[in-house]
Amino acid sequence: MSEPMSERERWQLELDKLQRGLQGDPFAFLGPQRDADGEGGVLRAYLPGAQRVELLDEDGATLAELEQSDPGSGLFQHHLERLPARYRLRTHWPDGVQESEDPYAFGPLLGELDLYLFAEGNHRQLASCLGAQLTRHEGVDGVRFAVWAPNAVRVSVVGDFNGWDGRRHPMRRRYPSGVWELFIPRLGAGELYKYELQGHAGLLPLKADPLALACETPPGTASKTCAALRHEWRDQDWLARRAERQGYAAPLSIYEVHAGSWRHRDGRPPRWSELAEELIPYVRQLGFSHIELMPVMEHPFGGSWGYQPLGLFAPTARYGTPEDFAGFVDACHQAGIGVILDWVPAHFPTDAHGLGRFDGTALYEYEHPFEGFHQDWDTYIYNLGRSEVHGFMLASALHWLRTYHVDGLRVDAVASMLYRDYSRKEGEWLPNRHGGRENLEAIDFLHHLNQVVASETPGALVIAEESTAWPGVSRPVAEGGLGFSHKWNMGWMHDSLAYIGEDPLHRRYHHHQLTFGLLYAFSEHFILPISHDEVVHGKHSLLDKMPGDRWQKFANLRLYLSFMWSHPGKKLLFMGCEFGQWREWNHDGELDWYLLRYPEHQGVQDLVATLNRLYHELPALHARDGEALGFEWLIGDDQANSVYAWLRHAAGEPSLLAVHNFTPVPRQGYRIGVPQGGDWDVLLNSDAQAYAGSGAGSQGRVASEPAGAHGQAQSLLLELPPLGTLLLRPAG
């Protein structure tokens, strides 16, 4: 049997752990260590590089000087007959003197309920629990750090405040949660920090805080201490009416924006305050109801457009502070504009400072690459079957909805979440526990997400970008659906863009591409999306997709937008499409605003403003977007002339007639049946000179005739403009 270690041998062993960065239980050795009698004891501080350390009472009087155990060891200690209840350390460094309370004199920080809820995956306020929280603890101001790393041997907080030395601030492990915590007194806002983790296989790259509330401006990758948001909100009226404004019967017209490339200031991306000054009035002028921001969560690579985020709780520092972002959202609401954020729970990038192999193991991601690595995007896939990861992502969603008052989340890449074999060949994926291809863990998460959002942030939207035929995406969970409020209609987008890209001479052979979408238009609560994805990577801008010469391109664009706005479904249009930008979108530049000097571009912009005005003013265009009763075909079979016509209905409101001519041939005397006799007003002619069109087609008022057509007793004899749309309703 070996001899028991002497006291010196024991602390030499502990010192060796500290010096080698292997001390996983610093509170058992550092700070006040009481003698067996409970009165006196040893007070230890490990401060490598310090020259002297004085022990002060709470009033600042010197009680003793701590002795360095061995010269240069960095371990300072002193035995006292009575350990003080409160004390401070005055540390003499080569470049100055620092006075502060001892981090290792404080008791545990997080409560058992917090740790239980986190482990359960149901801590709804995780953003105020883990991460770096400015707080007052045991009467002392400072920052409480907490991070989940259950498989780490040791975790330390490092930053400018300790010279990025991982030996200075090792953290306390809380069993069994795997959370590490430490309170650093007198630390404030604006400090850069990361976590240094010792894994079982050695030291890991410094990690940013997964729950950081603010981050360093890229290309820097550090987290930043940040006070809890103290914005004085003035959007109470908006929030009180939000559920009504965002209901299925309300008009929803979304302007999709990449904040950094909408409009530059002095050759640089804008700040949130500048966007509030310029973007909000612009959106109001054009009549959009909402702004959808491409991801503003902190992301290391600007070229990902935000779709590879690592700071799931922090607005990117590229455009300002968290307070600046809150001010932007508040200003939108006061102007009557909703804010939707793109949010990415499907995958995350492999940057060394990020979530991947966070504690030396596959913590946030699946272990097996067939489950945990996305080959198309070179990213990791969240293991949403792990309760802590499930709860982390749920808390992120709630953080944006509650803390920043955003009105909805557009969930990116839902299809990749639903299927284990998404974009994988045979033999490159693992089946679920039933042998199927569905990702049951992700489905459970989406169910939970949508139920919690509906319960805790009533009226908020959760929109799915989902490109497959998965049934019931926007059906309530209780009815067997995924529970989203809306789904992007990717099928409509692909078919309609393919059709409009055809030469008008050939469109008769593709007539079904516009009629097919109306077979399933009411199976979900759809949004018609013309998003950023359609104007990049060689796909051409929306204007440049149009066939023909310059005149035909603009006429086709005006026709396409008019077709879209009169079609069932809410609307989404990416910035630049509203005035017909020629070039593809470039995230490093700004939109080509100079084009608005030309009448054709100004005409497209004016048309979009008119379409939004009509869409909001006329219930027939929005009140029954998701109901078959709100739509009635009149002409869906005029393949020879590429003409389509339908009625839109709303209860107790006049019907609206939409007629589209997809050829450059004016159609004189084109008869269309209508449900009501008398005069009909032409509300819109997309070829009107007001929109830089040719001025052809019916204008003003048209009288009906008692000649039956298309199953209606009355009809109108119209002049259809070339490559144009007419919108009409009964006069009066």
Swiss-Prot record:
State any GO BP term from the record. Answer: glycogen biosynthetic process
Gene Ontology molecular function: any one: cation binding
Q: Provide the E.C. number(s) assigned to this enzyme.
A: 2.4.1.18
- GO CC terms of this entry: cytosol
CDD domains, per database record:
AmyAc_Glg_BE, E_set_GBE_prok_N
Active site as annotated? 412 (nucleophile), 465 (proton donor)
Disulphide bridges: none
- Pfam assignment, any one: GlgB_N
Q: Which Gene3D superfamilies match?
A: Glycosidases (3.20.20.80), Golgi alpha-mannosidase II (2.60.40.1180), Immunoglobulins (2.60.40.10)
Mark the transmembrane ranges: none
Q: Cite the record's note on assembly.
A: Monomer.
Give the function comment from the record.
Answer: Catalyzes the formation of the alpha-1,6-glucosidic linkages in glycogen by scission of a 1,4-alpha-linked oligosaccharide from growing alpha-1,4-glucan chains and the subsequent attachment of the oligosaccharide to the alpha-1,6 position.
Protein name per UniProt: 1,4-alpha-glucan branching enzyme GlgB
Q: Which organism is it from?
A: Pseudomonas paraeruginosa (strain DSM 24068 / PA7) (Pseudomonas aeruginosa (strain PA7))
